[in-house]
Amino acid sequence: MLKEKLIIIITLVMLLCACDIQEQSTQLAQIKAQNKIRVGTLASASNYYQAVQGEQGFEYELSQAFADYLGVELEIVPFFNLSDMFARLQSGDLDLIASGLTYNKTRAQQYRFGPTYRTISQKLVYKQGIERPRDYDDLTGNLMVIAKSSHSLTLQKVKKSNPELNWSETEEFDEEELLQAVIDGEIDYTLADTHTLSLFRRYHPNLSIGFSITHNDPIAWMLRKSNDDSLYALLVPFFGEAKQNNQLYVLEEKYFGHVRQFNYVNTLAYIEAIKETLPKYQPWFEQYAGTLDWRLLAALSYQESMWNPRAKSPTGVRGIMMLTRNTAKQVGVTNRLEPEQNIRGGAKYLSKLIKRIPDRIPQPDRTWLALAAYNVGWGHVNDARIITKQQGASPDKWADVKKRLPLLIKKRYYRKTRYGYSRGDVAVSYVDNIRRYYDALVWLDENNAIEEKPEAPVVAPKIGDEVEAK
């Protein structure tokens, strides 16, 4: 009897141990044990990159949010080609891939996809100046795409109904480098996803869209195919919460919200002005920026005056930073038409606005809110923040406030506010424009594409210029 009880006890212990061993062997258990999740991504402006402020990128921030959700550290592993990244996933060196990759049946045979969290479209692009291709029959030059990419898989599918279609593939270049090759005339065509194309056209407006290849392709994270559902099972509630609490929307707005609208003529004029006009004033932007990024100050100035020191609006704002008479007095500007004074005053005023933003609000939301205040005044921005809070959204997030600013033109909203009617819709476009100008200027500056700047010019007031007393 005692022996039988002992056997039962030993059996139960062994079963419990077996369950524990099985539990410890799951992917999620291993991640918890190591206290980190290893995420692979392609290094790019839309996924992951190193900036002055540290690590940045849509997929990086989303991956960090998932790591926080799991309660572990994030180990981001950047790659420069798909083959290496897929191989590392298959070998178990990565827990998942977060790289804005599209779902398709070919990939789904090899990998497991998480929930769809975005959609993109694929476009055929070419350089402005050659005849626009409107379908595959119009392609007369060389078309190149990345090997093993969704673009390659798409073309393989298209070729079944277009047998004359030919293209080459490469693992040496990434998507942005292929776009640059089109600009440089090294290739005639390539395919690009809409979000990458939108970011790239900020500083290369000559890149044009021939026609759409696909529409609304689903984007999802990728895992190894296995019977282990432990990690996959948590992706579903994570993305559900990210959509429910607006986290996905906020990230979309941060990285892509300001680049959805593209104007070829305006972008081309801006790039030209950076090379021809900006060098005259760049020393002053740098000198008076203080803790601000001088390139942000310059982008603000371009939005205000297109770097015209004699600019004037019907409402009485004047100069390269378009200061009102009252604002000029506040910041010690005696002549709004003198560009050095005006730049100094504009920088001082923007800094004051940023300091006025509640300390709890982090960057870059502080700056976007301050830019909106530069346009319509802090009072109106704060009215929009109050409406935002009343509607259950965050008054501290620009992505939420920008959706409510346009409500200030509607009587049923502005009559209940402290400062009343305001063109909040204009303020939203204003901030989006500055963000586009800033992004382009940063890229051109860091790639040494701005002309060498001369000594700051001395601009004497002409007869008839205003000279104001403090």
UniProtKB/Swiss-Prot annotation:
Topology relative to the membrane: Peripheral membrane protein
PROSITE patterns: PROKAR_LIPOPROTEIN, TRANSGLYCOSYLASE
Active site: E304
Region ranges (LT domain): 260-470
GO cellular component annotations of the record: cell outer membrane
Subcellular location: Cell outer membrane
Record key words, sorted: Cell outer membrane, Cell wall biogenesis/degradation, Lyase, Membrane, Signal
Pfam families: SBP_bac_3, SLT
Gene Ontology terms, MF aspect: peptidoglycan lytic transglycosylase activity
Reaction equation(s) it catalyzes: Exolytic cleavage of the (1->4)-beta-glycosidic linkage between N-acetylmuramic acid (MurNAc) and N-acetylglucosamine (GlcNAc) residues in peptidoglycan, from either the reducing or the non-reducing ends of the peptidoglycan chains, with concomitant formation of a 1,6-anhydrobond in the MurNAc residue
Signal peptide from the UniProt entry: 1-21
Region (Non-LT domain): 22-259
Function of the protein: Murein-degrading enzyme that degrades murein glycan strands and insoluble, high-molecular weight murein sacculi, with the concomitant formation of a 1,6-anhydromuramoyl product. Lytic transglycosylases (LTs) play an integral role in the metabolism of the peptidoglycan (PG) sacculus. Their lytic action creates space within the PG sacculus to allow for its expansion as well as for the insertion of various structures such as secretion systems and flagella.
Family stated for the protein in its record: In the N-terminal section; belongs to the bacterial solute-binding protein 3 family. In the C-terminal section; belongs to the transglycosylase Slt family.
Record remark: domains: The N-terminal domain does not have lytic activity and probably modulates enzymatic activity. The C-terminal domain is the catalytic active domain.
Protein name (Swiss-Prot/TrEMBL): Membrane-bound lytic murein transglycosylase F
